Amino acid sequence: MSAINTLPPIKSIFNDFKEITKAGLAISVVFSSLAGYLLGIHEFNLETIYVLLMLAIGGYCMVGASNAYNQIIEKDLDTLMNRTKNRPIPSGRMSVNTAFTIATILTITGLTILYMINPKTAMFGAISIFLYTCVYTPLKTVTSLSVFVGAFPGAIPFMLGWVAATNDFGIEAGTLFLIQFFWQFPHFWAIGWFLFEDYKKGGFYMLPTGKRDKGTAMQIVLYTLWLTAASILPSFGYTGRLYLTPVSAIIVVLLGLWMLVYAIKLYKNKTDKSAKTLMLVSVAYISLIQVVYILDKFLR
C-alpha cells in the first residue's frame, strides 16, 4: 500500500481541524469582534474592509488556539465525558504534538495579524489566550469561580472589535466588555445545568452553588437582569460615541425581557430542558443585541 493511501482523507483532516478549534464557537466569537469593529469605525472604505477581514482571520486564529490548548490540557478528562470523548485527541485521531503545533501556529499567526491592526488589539488577544488557557481551564476542576474568571476572556471579543477600529480603550469599549461579561453567567450556567452529569464525570465545577437548585437558578435570573441593564447603558448618553436611540433601547429591553422569561422558567421548573432552552435563547440574545446596535448606528 502506498504512503498516500495511508494518509487520512482531506475531509477528515479538515473536520478534525474544525473540531480542535471549535469552529462554531470560534465563528460566533469572531462575529462579536466584527460587531464591535463596525460600531467603532467612522465610515466604510477599502481600509476598514481590509481591517475587518484581518480581524476576522486573526480573531479566528486566537479563539481556535485557545480551544486547541484547552483540549490538550483536558485530554484525559475529555475521555470521561460523553460529549467530548470523540474529540480528535481523546479519540486518537490527532496526537497531542499535532494539536500543540496547530495551536502554536494559530497563536503566532493570530497575534501577528492583530498586531498589524494595532498593538492594543494584539495585547488584548494575548491576554484572552492566557486567561482562558492558563487560568480558566485549570480552575474548572477546582472551583465554580472558574466561570467568573472565564467571563473575562469571554467578554474581550466584543470590546476587541472597538479597540481594533479606534486603537483606544475607553468608555465605549468598556461598555461592550461589560455587556458580554454579564452575558457569560446565564449562558454558561445554563450549559452547566443541562450538562451537569457529564461535567460531573470530568470533575468540573460549573454551577455557583454546585447544584441544580434554586440558588443557581436565582443567580441566573439576577445576572440576566444585570445583562439587560448593561445592554441599555448606551441609551443614556454617558458612553461616548456608543449611543442607542430610544427605539433601539426599547428593542433591547424587550430582548432582555424575552431572555428573562426563560431564566424565570428555569427558576420555576429547574429542568434540563428549561436550561437548554435558556442557553439557546442566550445565544440568540447576544447576536440580536449586536445586530440592533449595528443597525441603530448605520440607520439613525
Curated annotation (Swiss-Prot):
Keywords, comma-separated and alphabetical: Cell inner membrane, Cell membrane, Heme biosynthesis, Membrane, Transferase, Transmembrane, Transmembrane helix
Name the UniProt record assigns to this protein: Protoheme IX farnesyltransferase
Signal peptide: none
GO BP terms in the entry: heme A biosynthetic process; heme O biosynthetic process
GO CC, one annotated term: plasma membrane
Source organism of the structure: Flavobacterium psychrophilum (strain ATCC 49511 / DSM 21280 / CIP 103535 / JIP02/86)
Main subcellular localisation: membrane
Keyword Transmembrane helix: yes
Gene: ctaB
Enzyme class: transferase
EC number: 2.5.1.141
Protein location: Cell inner membrane
